Amino acid sequence: MDRTAKADLVSTLNGVFNANAVVVVAHYKGLTVADMQKLRSQMKQAGATVKVAKNRLASIALDGTDVASIKPLLKGPTLLAYSSDPVAAAKVAVDFAKTNDKLVILGGAMGTTALNPDGVKALASLPSLDELRAKLVGLIQAPATKVAQVVNAPAAKLARVFGAYAKKDEAA
């Protein structure tokens, strides 16, 4: 790779690090080509991307970015998974690592926050941005009658109790 290609790669990676919400770093030693293709396709389906780059070039590209805290993780055969959705890359990486022990999650970063492997796993357990939006829309679209029922339920129960006492007193 000549100097201009390296400079282009550093510039591209710098843009990637600045544009994405989360970056996950993992060791991939021992993964077969088929496994790597499977990981890439799963990432693509989730809206995330996997990139293998020279550690030295990735380290240079990290300078001046919010995710610069992952620099110490760039040792050995590392891959970078990133996505604009704060959960997508972490979720796919953790799920893939569960089924394939050759992918070892080293950590990552979400914005300026550095994540250890447990932090990446915790991030992966959160619902995605789309799932949260769907829940919010569902709550907003709940019919007003349900809200009225919830508000009126205590009064209705109280009225039934008073009615039962009244019938009991009449019978006595």
Curated annotation (Swiss-Prot):
State the PROSITE patterns in the record: RIBOSOMAL_L10
GO MF annotations in UniProt: large ribosomal subunit rRNA binding; structural constituent of ribosome
Q: Which UniProt keywords apply?
A: Ribonucleoprotein, Ribosomal protein, RNA-binding, rRNA-binding
Pfam families, per this entry? Ribosomal_L10
Q: Which GO terms describe its cellular component?
A: large ribosomal subunit
Query: InterPro entries annotated for this entry?
Result: Ribosomal_uL10 (IPR001790), Ribosomal_uL10-like_sf (IPR043141), Ribosomal_uL10_bac (IPR022973), Ribosomal_uL10_bac_type (IPR047865), Ribosomal_uL10_CS_bac (IPR002363)
GO biological process, any:
translation
Sum up the protein's function in the record's words: Forms part of the ribosomal stalk, playing a central role in the interaction of the ribosome with GTP-bound translation factors.
- Record-stated family: Belongs to the universal ribosomal protein uL10 family.
The record's annotation in HAMAP family points to:
Ribosomal_uL10
Q: Please give the subunit comment from the record.
A: Part of the ribosomal stalk of the 50S ribosomal subunit. The N-terminus interacts with L11 and the large rRNA to form the base of the stalk. The C-terminus forms an elongated spine to which L12 dimers bind in a sequential fashion forming a multimeric L10(L12)X complex.
Identify this protein by name: Large ribosomal subunit protein uL10
Species per Swiss-Prot/TrEMBL record: Methylorubrum extorquens (strain PA1) (Methylobacterium extorquens)
Taxonomic placement: Bacteria, Pseudomonadati, Pseudomonadota, Alphaproteobacteria, Hyphomicrobiales
Gene designation per UniProt: rplJ
